[in-house]
């Protein structure tokens, strides 16, 4: 006998632009420029409201934009969850960072060795913040660490595509009193892949560990501006080597400190450093390092963590499981961690009665503007075939966010139209079982794909 499910449909990155239709073309508002007959129909027929998914309403600093991780964490918890960015900022502001016992042990281990800081250098606040790196380097210097290298990952996805030169200028100024050197610069496309495209990680590994890449002739900001002039942008920046070129820079006994606070895009590079049986790409050398992370990326890593996860109880998945009900989490690869790890409070725990389905994201394109439908059709087929087996379904459609990140408006429009068709199919099937649906988003993105200037 089929169940009558409750389905939470998360249209990832489908936001509301305050300028409305009058500003739709100027802002590149794909949600309004697209043809969305089903969205328009249900918006007219059923109750609706708006949600705030940024700033203090989701546990971020005032004025900080939301993101997928934060949105899913708050949705799953059913309350405001103060984010790692907020917690870390507060710790630094209150002068408590230097007193962190794990941090003290880390920098004690780095004395007489080389300390490598690795992470995303921007103020996007989604995966990291460059000011955290400056604060950490200051504590390292005060702790007696002398040899500090920074392997900077440029953003261009959660920030301006050419903002990296400015961030590296600010970073160099902040690091000057610590003696830390920017050794490597590489785009997040290579260093932070999360879809097992190991050939991208290989390029970043070779740069960070072996010093392979274009040798810089000028300071990092000037080198980046020269790349911009050639059409290269931060996200896709190929490795730039600023110190110790063509030598093994990460050596046995060194300390490697990944300072991103968001886990999902850190794991592949982390595993390359940690796993003796790693087979994602040919490492050529495998330095045995003291690996440290700012937050917990995966409990199984068994590495020191500076900020441990918050303990969240009575979250949605737990309550449903405790009631003896069955639940399904389903998304394509790009958003699978969000409906599982993040929705479950930032832990890997899978509750009793919780099933998970991952639909592979396309691997035949470099960027999703080239395939804006992504795997939404396959996700829709999978979920409609399974709906009657579950009491609760958590469903994510990735397209509005992932295509929104590309900034290609025509593709964003196609992504929105694709999702409108897919949501129609899910709604019709759910209602045929006597079920109910809540259609929402975790944060906005494709409602503003162009900068007005």
Question: Which functions belong to the PLM regions below?
Answer:
Residues 1-453:
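Feature captures the catalytic ectodomains and active-site-proximal regions of enzymes
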């Amino acid at each position: 006998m089929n169940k009558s499910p409750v389905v939470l449909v998360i249209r990832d990155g489908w936001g509301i632009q305050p300028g409305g239709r009058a500003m739709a073309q100027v802002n590149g508002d794909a949600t309004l420029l697209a043809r969305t007959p089903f969205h328009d129909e249900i918006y007219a027929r059923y109750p609706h409201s708006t949600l705030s998914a940024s700033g203090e309403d989701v546990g971020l600093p005032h004025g900080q934009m939301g993101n997928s991780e934060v949105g899913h964490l708050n949705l799953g918890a059913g309350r405001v969850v103060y984010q790692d960015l907020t917690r870390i900022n507060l710790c630094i502001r209150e002068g408590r960072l230097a007193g962190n016992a794990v941090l003290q042990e880390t920098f004690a281990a780095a004395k007489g060795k080389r300390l490598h800081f690795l992470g995303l250098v921007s103020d996007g606040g989604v995966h990291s913040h460059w000011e955290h790196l400056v604060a950490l380097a200051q504590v390292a210097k005060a702790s007696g660490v002398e040899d500090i290298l920074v392997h900077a990952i440029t953003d261009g996805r959660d920030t301006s595509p050419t903002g990296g030169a400015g961030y590296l200028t600010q970073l160099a100024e902040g690091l000057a009193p610590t003696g830390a050197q920017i050794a490597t610069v590489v785009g997040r496309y290579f260093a932070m892949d999360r879809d097992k495209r190991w050939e991208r990680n290989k390029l970043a590994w070779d740069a960070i560990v072996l010093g392979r890449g274009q040798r810089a002739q000028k300071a990092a900001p000037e080198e980046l501006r020269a790349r911009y002039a050639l059409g290269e942008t931060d996200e896709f920046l190929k490795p730039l080597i600023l110190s110790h070129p063509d030598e093994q820079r990460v050596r046995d006994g060194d300390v490697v400190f990944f300072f991103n606070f968001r886990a999902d895009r850190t794991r592949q590079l982390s595993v390359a450093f940690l796993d003796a049986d790693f087979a994602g790409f040919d490492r050529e050398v495998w330095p045995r390092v003291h690996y440290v992370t700012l937050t917990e990326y995966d409990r199984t890593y068994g590495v020191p963590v500076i900020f441990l996860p918050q303990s969240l109880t009575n979250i949605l998945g737990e309550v449903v499981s405790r009631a003896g009900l069955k639940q399904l989490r389903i998304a394509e690869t790009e958003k699978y961690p969000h409906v599982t790890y993040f929705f479950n409070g930032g832990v890997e725990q899978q509750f009793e009665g919780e099933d998970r389905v991952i639909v592979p994201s396309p691997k035949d394109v470099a960027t999703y503007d080239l395939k804006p439908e992504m795997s939404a059709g396959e996700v829709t087929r999978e979920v409609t075939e399974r709906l009657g087996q579950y009491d609760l379904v958590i469903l994510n459609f990735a397209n509005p966010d992932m295509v929104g990140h590309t900034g290609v408006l025509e593709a964003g429009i196609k992504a929105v139209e694709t999702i409108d068709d897919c949501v129609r199919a899910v709604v019709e099937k759910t209602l045929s079982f006597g079920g109910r649906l809540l259609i929402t988003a975790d944060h906005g993105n494709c409602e503003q794909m162009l900068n007005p200037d």
